[in-house]
Amino acid sequence: MRVIARIASASAVLLSAAAFAQTEQPGPSIMYKNLEYRFGVIFPNQVQPMVRDTTYTTKDGATVPARQFYLERPGEWYTVTMVRLPNGPPIDKAHVDRTAEQILKKGTAQFNYSYCYDPGIPGRQLNMREPNGNQLRASMYMWDNRLYIAEASAPVGTHDALQFEQSITILDPMGNDLDNGQGSPACP
């Protein structure tokens, strides 16, 4: 009888632990896709982002219009800024590097990596500590005269910020991911 009681107790503990673990796991992620601006990203809690017009200063000092998709919550924010740069080459790593230089001014870099999103698509990823203690995760890429800048500022270790920054996806005009699974070789 004691064996049965112990098995029943152990089963109850295991089932409770399993139920608790399930409640602690993030739910399914649904990517927000914007076909007009050709990107996708996972915003926290599947919210539709707010949209605002902004400007971007190019590597040559010109100010050009940009569109920003964003979510702000107490103590954290998430943005994707998309800049169209039609008067230059379709891919210009100098724009990516200049963007990284500007973001690096916001805090202390803990990770600064240059690589390709996919062959021929230059990119950078940054992981920084901001003066307010938040972690700033950023990635930037250029493709087809479009500069994509994803930034997430949140308390250190926030799952939503990591998922947001890592989920940025460049889309073709039909909404398909440009990442063809060929790996991410170093960019020249």
Predicted regions mapped to residue ranges:
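N-terminal signal peptide c-region/cleavage motif recognized by signal peptidases
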Residues: 16-18
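Short acidic/polar N-terminal linker immediately downstream of export determinants
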Residues: 26-36, 55, 177
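Envelope-exposed proteins and targeting segments
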Residues: 28, 37-39, 43-45, 76-78, ...
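Surface-exposed amphipathic alpha-helical segments
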Residues: 35, 47-50, 95-108, 145-188
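Signature of long, low-cysteine stretches enriched in small and polar/charged residues
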Residues: 40-69, 97-143
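A short acidic-to-branched-hydrophobic micro-motif
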Residues: 66-95, 149
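Bacterial N-terminal signal peptides that target proteins for export
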Residues: 1-11
